């Protein structure tokens, strides 16, 4: 069973700046995206030509996903396009999950970001979960683009990310107090 989700966002920032956030700083998505409490580079993956890293591990705030390793499948610096797939940490019912990103210049201070997610699921329980997964992934994708826009345009994280960070600190505080 195959799902495809597409989205786009116009951002009032130069394409080069947005590309830097998405591609050059690929491993630091956890600094600005609320669905990703933390992220880091995978040091033992070789980086494609032009990329800083070969992949990242993201701790997610999305139910059903634990730490997900994402590995570049393509990277094209001149055309500002890349794709990556979740290679580890996917829920058992997902056979394949891949995202394609492209950044286009619409002028010196405006860019367009396009995202396409491709997901292949097992027929069971995919048939039943597909509508919920599509809804959840669509919502998370829209929020991530909104947070990217905010981050690129204002050089600061979205209030939703700040709130998520505060929740994470509060969640960890009782654990630290017990030790």
Regions inferred by a protein language model and the residue ranges of each:
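Residue-level preference for beta-strand/loop junctions
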Residues: 1-3, 64, 95, 109
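Hydrophobic ligand-binding cavity/cleft-lining segments
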Residues: 1-48, 174-179
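Hydrophobic/aromatic beta-strand elements that line small-molecule binding cavities or substrate pockets
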Residues: 7-9, 68-74, 97-105
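Short loop segments at secondary-structure junctions
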Residues: 12-16, 76, 106-108
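Glycine-rich portal/gate segments that line the openings of hydrophobic small-molecule binding cavities
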Residues: 30, 40-92, 112, 143-166, ...
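Hydrophobic, well-ordered secondary-structure segments
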Residues: 35-43, 59, 96, 103-104
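Beta-strand/loop substructures that line and gate deep hydrophobic ligand-binding cavities in soluble
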Residues: 86-143, 150, 159
């Amino acid at each position: 069973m195959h799902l495809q989700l597409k989205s786009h966002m116009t951002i009032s920032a130069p394409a080069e700046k947005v590309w830097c956030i998405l591609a050059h700083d690929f491993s630091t998505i956890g600094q600005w995206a609320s669905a990703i409490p933390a992220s880091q580079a995978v040091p033992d993956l070789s980086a494609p030509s032009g990329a800083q890293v070969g992949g990242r591990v993201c701790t997610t705030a999305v139910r059903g996903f634990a730490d997900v390793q994402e590995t570049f499948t393509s990277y094209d610096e001149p055309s500002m396009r890349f794709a990556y797939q979740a290679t580890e940490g996917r829920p058992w019912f997902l056979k394949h999950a891949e995202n394609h990103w492209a950044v286009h210049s619409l002028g010196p201070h405006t860019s367009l970001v396009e995202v396409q997610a491709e997901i292949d699921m097992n027929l069971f329980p995919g048939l039943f979960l597909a509508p919920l997964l599509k809804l959840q992934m669509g919502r998370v994708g829209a929020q991530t683009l909104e947070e990217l826009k905010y981050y690129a345009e204002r050089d600061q994280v979205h209030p939703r990310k700040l709130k998520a960070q505060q929740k994470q600190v509060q969640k960890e505080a009782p654990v630290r107090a017990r030790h």
